[in-house]
């Protein structure tokens, strides 16, 4: 049996290491979404992590501050290690 431990430092993590990790997010409308993350890079250097197969942005990456933040409409989230 494996135990998932939340990735506590997701706000400062390189977005590339979050690819494929399990994420559980709660939206402002109290909808819970559970799935794996995929990375979308933009030409300006910014990046977005979203659920695979779903177009919802979950995490926004700011290359100027090297930090991650929850996208608009996301109230809380947890990111877990790869299994």
Ranges and model annotations:
Residues 26-34, 72:
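Short coil-to-beta-strand transition motifs
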